[in-house]
């Protein structure tokens, strides 16, 4: 089995193997020959840089299918269980639906999300899947840190004061 981030089912692609593991491989897309009708251009200006939204290149129904399939595969392949995962009930609005917001603060004081598979912070002002209130809170904390010269936590040194976490919103998620 080869895991290829950002590939969409049904596509014909050229890929490069980037990592070989015991029972699988990881790869990256080199060229897409036949894009899936379920592939779309992400509206997010941070897509491809930020690791916070791995499915924004998919239509929303395909995103729900991919998430369900990921759980089904993990239960079957890793867990050895023969269970059927039910269909995912999607959000009423596929934007600003995330009910847990966690914004890391970079050593330079930038606030955003980690770049995929790294702990490098990609500065972000507005996220399409976080609540607008969470975005405003993150920006306010960033301004507060700059104003009062509050140091960000640096995981390499273990020093610093701030790693931002915004709790869930109480509003109905549908």
Listing of model-derived features with the role each one plays in the protein:
Residues 168-174:
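Single conserved hydrophobic/aromatic residue that forms the stacking wall/gate
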